[in-house]
């Protein structure tokens, strides 16, 4: 996109950017430039994890996941664990198949740099309280990455309200 002055290329770029604006309005993102198109959530989660791994995470840092994560939100962090000697902690599910915020809070340590969680579990149907988790995390300068594959088609999304750092 934006690679030519030919009228067809300009028309394609305009359509592409109009789509970005439509998505921005639909999910109430602050700015259309926050919208990054990928082939899917797996690619998006890999992109975020790899970028954070290269630019932000260091040996000894910790990442917090939950026991409900889909493989696509586990594997990229697992690779970082191996390549950068980063620790992964897991917040446990309760007997109802949910993850109370207390289970997340008790797993946060001073070394926690990223919380990577799903919005809605495709295993139990549990909806995680993303806004509350983000508030807790941001108070401790922790980045929040949300796997929204199940949440996006089933929940009304408001990125400004959720305030997470990345939503795939």
Model-derived features: where do they sit?
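Pyridoxal 5′-phosphate
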Residues: 1-168
């Amino acid at each position: 996109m934006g690679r030519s002055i030919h009228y067809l290329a300009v028309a394609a770029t305009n359509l592409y950017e109009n789509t970005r604006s439509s998505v921005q309005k639909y999910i109430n993102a602050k700015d259309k430039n926050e919208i990054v198109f990928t082939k899917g959530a797996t690619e998006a989660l890999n992109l975020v994890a790899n970028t954070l791994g290269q630019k932000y995470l260091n040996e000894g840092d910790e990442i917090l996941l939950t026991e409900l994560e889909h493989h696509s939100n586990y594997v990229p962090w697992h690779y970082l664990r191996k390549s950068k000697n980063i620790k992964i902690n897991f917040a446990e599910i309760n007997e109802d198949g949910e993850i109370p915020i207390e289970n997340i809070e008790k797993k946060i340590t001073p070394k926690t740099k990223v919380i990577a969680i799903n919005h809605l579990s495709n295993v139990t149907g549990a909806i995680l309280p993303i806004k509350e988790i983000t508030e807790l995390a941001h108070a401790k300068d922790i980045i929040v990455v949300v796997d929204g594959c199940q949440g996006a088609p089933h929940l009304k999304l408001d990125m400004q309200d959720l305030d997470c750092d990345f939503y795939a």
